Amino acid sequence: MVRLTIDDQLAEVEEGATVLDACKAAGVEVPTLCYVPFLAPYGACRMCTVKVADNGSSRLTTACTLPAAEGMKIVTDDDDVREARKIVLELLLARAPDAEILHELAAAYGIEKSRFLAAPKEEAAPVAEGAPEFELEAKPKKCILCGSCYRVCEQRVQAFAIGL
């Protein structure tokens, strides 16, 4: 077992668990967008950013990709962590202004509008001649680039049919 401190609370998890696993085990809520329990950790969305405090210094990192280590001290909610998450949300909102999940999180973080410029409108890719008679509707203004579609296709279905 690995013991670590999360927001001044002792947590214990199995060897090989991530900091996100430890937070969940301790009942500490950490927001995620790209985390899918049955897929390998990815860290693309950066919403699970936490602070790792060590020997008087600290660094921000993703909880879903960081292996829990003995004696680790984790901070999940302070000014630095909140500011990092707010910037991530604003960037994602500029990229995907129609994504409802982003608006829910933005409201929780007090964000009404992104301060960053919106992404230019993406045109649909042309359909190749002789392509099958079906169409997958892409919604680029809703895509938050979490990689979940791609990773499920690759890791679970093993079709390797979707690219990022």
What label would you give each PLM region?
Residues 11-70, 84:
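N-terminal cofactor/phosphate-binding cores enriched in small/glycine residues
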Residues 46, 54-164:
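Fe-S ferredoxin-like electron-transfer domains
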Residues 1-9:
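Eukaryote-biased recognition of intrinsically disordered, low-complexity regulatory segments
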Residues 9-10, 129:
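A generic secondary-structure micro-motif detector
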